[in-house]
Amino acid sequence: MSPRRSVCWFVLGQLLCSCAVALQGGMLFPKETPSRELKVLDGLWSFRADYSNNRLQGFEKQWYRQPLRESGPTLDMPVPSSFNDITQEAELRNFIGWVWYEREAVLPQRWTQDTDRRVVLRINSAHYYAVVWVNGIHVVEHEGGHLPFEADITKLVQSGPLTTFRVTIAINNTLTPYTLPPGTIVYKTDPSMYPKGYFVQDISFDFFNYAGLHRSVVLYTTPTTYIDDITVTTDVDRDVGLVNYWISVQGSDHFQLEVRLLDEDGKIVARGTGNEGQLKVPRAHLWWPYLMHEHPAYLYSLEVTMTTPESVSDFYTLPVGIRTVAVTKSKFLINGKPFYFQGVNKHEDSDIRGRGFDWPLLIKDFNLLRWLGANSFRTSHYPYSEEVLQLCDRYGIVVIDECPGVGIVLPQSFGNVSLRHHLEVMDELVRRDKNHPAVVMWSVANEPVSSLKPAGYYFKTLIAHTKALDPTRPVTFVSNTRYDADMGAPYVDVICVNSYLSWYHDYGHLEVIQLQLTSQFENWYKMYQKPIIQSEYGADAVSGLHEDPPRMFSEEYQTALLENYHLILDEKRKEYVIGELIWNFADFMTNQSPLRVTGNKKGIFTRQRNPKMAAFILRERYWRIANETRGYGSVPRTQCMGSRPFTF
């Protein structure tokens, strides 16, 4: 690497190393209440990529000091969305480095003049590094592409007459061995093959590294003394539901808290006062997963009211599901009853939008999950939007909540620098998602090279840290390492195993699946005596490609492979296998390679959500299992999801 190039990337690294200074404290989902206002900044933003050789021109020329359009040509960029697929420019689709977003807005006069009001800027997802300015003044930086961060901008907007409000966000999608997910920048130095300075981003995960503002950017207000955080855990004592709460208030030490728990009909069923306490709910309605109860996903509302001697008030309402989770040697229990994960793995991925949040797509996906008879999914391989988890709470879809620890394959990615960042990511993930009843387990990684010696200490530390953050949920990671070589498996509560028998090896030989899968399960259980989830399995199928006898990439081969897996899963779920998650719910985009024809085709639905033959095979299976394991009458093919209109 040339000295100049080394200096450029060193400067970039210095900028990025500071990206963990976002607002500390709670991370309650922003919503309108009697004391809080919300302004959503979705829509068209000004956008430009920094194509300079060192990618630092925007910082060197301080693009944030004036409107972005004055720095040079800009594009209209929709937010939320990935920037990659919006234009016809291949250079932008594959761009690595800094891109710049900007949006101007008008604030209500009361926000800028009411000194009893606090104004907060929240970015729900900026992939991967982000630096944020308001009216040219630096307000926050953040590392990590899938979790929200905030900045209190009250002083900026209330410091004097405000004629304009301009938000500038610089985002860098460069991945290093120490990021989550990791990656490397590889320079191609052969002058006979590559132009000077040519580089590519190398990644060890099989999905496209979409980038941009993937979720909403919002402004919201609170009183200057405000409810900062709420933590809820639940338990059951016979037929009495127990709701334990802890509330954090910022801005003053002088306040009173009143807590009310309301049922779905709006009736108050319990009251409390103070920062912490326990609410007892006689004859409680429990939160049950979809297809496990005739009235699944029952949600109470926890209403918190804070008042101060100065007559300042703050209100916040949190949906609460009363349920318990436990793990034995061979069972996963929800409310004391065995639960079988009959579900899918997903991606936040769609045409044009990339990883951008999209309500129509989200509702379509949930309707397909219910049609399928699926009761669960894993957020492979990163945290999904909060709106996804809110719908899971409402619909009774159980979630294995996974952090972006995918592609951890290099020895340096198991060092102290990576571990420190990984611990911070789990802090952020648990802080955001701790109150969702649908979240029943944390996953700290997917397919790490956990046979490496440092992996033992790494996962022991990481899992212990996650358990300390949340003692109420089991912790796992998803492995594709041999059972007798996995250094992290001793520390998980549930074994999650990925295997692609007759796909990535023994190509086309469906006849070996049953023997190999039986051996897989028996070896893992014999060594660890823990329940097992088949966390990934599947085969690529090009929609409309048919071959009989089945051949690879045909829909027939995909269904035949699934059916061979199902024969053994049916045997082992009577013993210690507690779930199966197909890979994947829908086709999704990947990097270009000879092994991928416009992405990964292992979906049982196409990227446009049209079913392949495998979707009908899986639907028949999941509804059969639901009827076999039901604890009440015949399972209806459609279930009502609550009687009250639902708002987030």
Curated annotation (Swiss-Prot):
Subcellular location, principal: other
Biological processes per GO annotation: carbohydrate metabolic process; chondroitin sulfate proteoglycan catabolic process; heparan sulfate proteoglycan catabolic process; hyaluronan catabolic process
Gene3D superfamilies: Galactose-binding domain-like, Glycosidases, Immunoglobulins
Documented EC number(s): 3.2.1.31
Subcellular location: Lysosome
Regulation: Inhibited by L-aspartic acid.
GO molecular function, one term: hydrolase activity
Keywords: Glycoprotein, Glycosidase, Hydrolase, Lysosome, Signal
Catalytic activity: a beta-D-glucuronoside + H2O = D-glucuronate + an alcohol
Record note on quaternary structure: Homotetramer.
Function: Plays an important role in the degradation of dermatan and keratan sulfates.
Name this protein carries in UniProt: Beta-glucuronidase
